[in-house]
Structure formats: structure tokens, C-alpha cells
Amino acid sequence: MHDIEHIRKNPKGFEKAIKSRGVKEFTAKEILEIDHKKRSLTTKLQALNKQRNEVTEEIKRLKMNKSPCEEQVKLSKSITSEIETISLKEQTEKNKLVDILSNLPNISAQNVPIGEDESSNVEIRKYGKKRKFDFTPKFHYELGERLGLMDFEQAAKISGSRFTILKGQLAKLGRALINFMLETHVNEFAYTEVYHPALVKNEAMYNVGQLPKFSDDSYLTTDKLRLIPTSEVVLTNLVADKIIEEKELPIRFTAYSECFRKEAGSAGRDTRGMIRQHQFGKVELVSITTEDQSKDELERMTNAAEEILKKLELPYRIMLLCSGDMGFAAQKTYDIEVWLPEQNKYREISSCSNCGTFQARRMNTKYFLETDRKTKKYVHTLNGSALAIGRTIVAIMENYQNSDGSVTIPNVLQRYMSNDTVISKQ
């Protein structure tokens, strides 16, 4: 959610910032007009409430003196009726304002490049050497099916398209990755592990910016609960409607969960394999910080996600996303892209974002200043995938494949896999 005070003070700047996020037809004029109507109605309500209070006091005084007060009672009823009418009008204007602001993305941070799509993203750094194969490498789905450990056909019969069944050592690899990632984030980066529900209320989705904009991309149950598209929804809402002591910040959470997305806008993209699924596992990071901490926290969070890839010895690069390619709630985002040799390109495996106060305003989460407890500020929220399990399996299979179709298990994972060193056909 946006700060209406900021829009009032700099409507042209706000308009330009929103347009850079891809909302080309946006104008701040409508917001200011609705805001003006709402404020005028609020002023009228305040005056009427004051007048009614004065009349009420006069009625009390007259009754104490046993004087006639019929006219004052009549006036009080008239004022009350007018208050009810204007209150409804004020609420209508409030709803209009919230509806418009709720559908506008966050404003980019100052150092975010302006651009419309991924072609304007900026490479920050690379890590690792790309493996040179002495044979023609295969796609992960070819390897998985030949190993008899990855079953797309039966998954489609059971659930439809964009689902996968993993068996044997590949299922074990997924479990190993979950344990490895969580242990790394908890032990080396001081995140608190959380186990949480996979179903949430609409309010929780709204708080993080998933609703109302992306309503069609989530799965809604008959009793109006939604399957989470990411653990970010729950982890961020752990502090909803709270006022936190500044000394308690930053707060850091991590969780593994299954995630569910309709992928409504992905028709025809990545139709084979595990890159884009309706259900996928992911380890998520969420941080709640002060205004001054959030910039450094984004770098720290990105480093935590990077550390997983470094330990797995997978080549990757860090991309700073442009204004038009960032997620709805983000003000600055780093994408981590892992190298996939068969595709001969880097593919996103993690996204780490600083959302500033955007989510905090929606869920009303603030912190007391240590130096002045009368002053409260909105917290900053950050989130990052560290990492997506399915895409990490893809990266391991394609980078660690052998000429006979087997897959070498990265050294760091072998202790989680009964000291196995190779995934081979059983």
C-alpha cells in the first residue's frame, strides 16, 4: 500500500514512478480527487460530531434544570441522521481509494534500473565455472525418465499437466536439499525455522500484495481459504497487526513448504520438465527490519541464497531487476540465475526482494523507536527463495550428469543421502 501523504506532496513524481513499473495509463489525478472528497467529508463529520456533542451537553443541562429540551432533542436526531448519511459517503470514497491503491505496485528504489522487461536487467556478478562436457548433455527430464525416477506421464493421469512424481533417489535428493538448505540458513545465517499452514485467509494474501491483483493465479477452496503460492505469505504475516520493539529487529524466519500456483500467464512456456509447476517445494527466507537495516539485509539475504549454490558448486549469476520486471510488492530485487548446460543459459532459481514499507502498511506492522517510544514507524519486509527445490534438482541433474545417464551427487549432499555418491538406474 502507498502513503497517501507522499502522493499529495509529489503527485507527478508518484505518477512517473508507477508508470515505470508498467502501469502505463496511470494518472494521479483520480487518486487526488477521491482523496479530496474523502477529506472534505471527514471534515464535515468532525464538525457534525462536535455539534452533536454540544447539543447533547445542552440537553443534559436543560434536563438537570427541568427545562424544556424538545427542540434540542429534535436537532440531535437530525444531526445523527446527517452523520449516518455522510459516514456512508465517506466510507464509499475510502473504499474507492483503497481499491485503486491496492492495485498499484510498489515504487522502485532509487538505484533500480528503469526498463520494461528482462532485457533491461543488470548483471551484478557471476560465480563458478561452467562445466565442459565431452558428450552431449541431456535435459533433466530425459535423464529422470531414463533413470526411471521421474514420472510425468503418471502425474498427468493423476493430476493433470505441470505436475511431477519423483521416486527413489530423486525423491531422496529433494528431501536432502530441504534439510541441507534449512540447516544452512538456521546455523549459518541465524534464521528461525517455522512450520506453518498451507492454507490462508484472503486477508493474509492481501497483506503481502498477492490480492487483489493476482487473485486468478491462486487456488481458492470452497470455504474461501487459499493455497499459498509461497511461504512468504505466512512468514510475513507472523508479525501482522503488531508493534515491535526496535531492539528485537531484525527478525528472520525460514520455512520449507509446498507452493501452489495456477501459472495462468505461462501458457506454452516450459511445458516439459520441472521448471514451471502448479505445485513445487521451496525454502523461503523472510526478514522484518527497521528502515535503516533493510538495505544491508537484502544483501545478507541474497548471500544466504548464494551460499547454497556455492556449497553445491553450481555456476550462477546475480541480476538486478529493472523496474518493469520486479514483482508487485518489491522495491528492489536480485534474481539468482543458475546455469543450465542443455539450455545453454542461466535460469532463475531464487528471487530476493526488499519491499520497504509496502507490505507493512497493508498489514499495519510498526516498531517503537528506542530513542523515542512515542514515535512509531512501519517496519520494512524482505523475502527470498533460498532455494526452489525442483529447480535445484534440475540444476544438479543437468550440471552433474554423466555420459552413462547417471548423476553424481554433490559432495555437500552425500551425508544427507546415506553417503551415496551417484544417482543411477536401479
Swiss-Prot record:
PROSITE patterns: AA_TRNA_LIGASE_II. GO terms for cellular component: cytoplasm. One of its GO terms (molecular function) is serine-tRNA ligase activity. It is an enzyme of class 6 (ligase). Its main location: cytoplasm. HAMAP family: Ser_tRNA_synth_type1. Homodimer. The tRNA molecule binds across the dimer. One of its GO terms (biological process) is selenocysteine biosynthetic process. It is found in: Cytoplasm. ATP binds at R261, K262, E263, E348, I349, S350, S351. Its EC number is 6.1.1.11. It comes from the Bacteria. Pathway: Aminoacyl-tRNA biosynthesis; selenocysteinyl-tRNA(Sec) biosynthesis; L-seryl-tRNA(Sec) from L-serine and tRNA(Sec): step 1/1. Keywords: Aminoacyl-tRNA synthetase, ATP-binding, Cytoplasm, Ligase, Nucleotide-binding, Protein biosynthesis. Belongs to the class-II aminoacyl-tRNA synthetase family. Type-1 seryl-tRNA synthetase subfamily. This is Serine--tRNA ligase. Pfam families: Seryl_tRNA_N (PF02403), tRNA-synt_2b (PF00587). L-serine binds at T230, S231, E232, E284, S385. The keyword ATP-binding applies. Catalyzes the attachment of serine to tRNA(Ser). Is also able to aminoacylate tRNA(Sec) with serine, to form the misacylated tRNA L-seryl-tRNA(Sec), which will be further converted into selenocysteinyl-tRNA(Sec). The keyword Protein biosynthesis applies.
